């Protein structure tokens, strides 16, 4: 009798855990503090989650996470620094440190940046004039297609 009770309890616990599990839907992420979890384009997904439609995380080196600014193991995304509206601005990243993130709406970046110069900024931390961006800007390991999709998304932000 004890074996049957244990078996029934184990089955019920398994069903409960399965019901509580995540049920991913196409074109969604587990959700972030920046987005709703539903994205209309790959570029928008990248901006808010640093993950491409393929499910691949877009990694980086440097940036606020390397400086200890992203406390609690937060995931760094474009929106983390440049905001949901792309306007950037001065904000605190913990421990009395501030960051002045650039406005990256495409309408503001033009004519200083084109796609090639934007790629250098995103992947190598290089400004259009050849100087290095400060250490707050991560150096992203992003594919050419994902970068093109991100630029297309930035072009839609008013």
Language-model-detected regions and their locations in the chain:
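Bacterial signal peptide processing site
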Residues: 21-23
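C-terminal capping alpha-helices of c-type cytochrome domains
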Residues: 39-42, 115-128, 135-158
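Short Fe-S-cluster ligation motifs
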Residues: 46-49, 53-54, 108-122, 129-131
């Amino acid at each position: 009798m004890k074996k049957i009770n244990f078996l029934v309890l184990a089955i019920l616990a398994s069903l409960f855990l399965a019901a509580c599990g995540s049920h991913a839907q196409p074109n969604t992420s587990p959700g972030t503090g920046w987005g709703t979890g539903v994205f209309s384009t790959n570029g928008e997904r990248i901006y808010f989650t640093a993950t491409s439609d393929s499910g691949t995380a877009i990694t980086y080196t440097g940036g606020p996470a390397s400086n200890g600014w992203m406390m609690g193991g937060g995931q760094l995304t474009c929106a983390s620094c440049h905001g949901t509206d792309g306007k950037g601005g001065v904000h605190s990243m913990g421990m009395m440190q501030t960051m002045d993130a650039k406005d990256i709406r495409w309408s503001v970046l033009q004519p200083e940046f084109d796609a090639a110069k934007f790629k250098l900024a995103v992947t190598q931390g290089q400004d259009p004039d050849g100087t290095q961006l400060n250490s707050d800007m991560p150096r992203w390991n992003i594919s050419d297609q994902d970068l093109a999709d991100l630029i297309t998304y930035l072009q839609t932000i008013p």
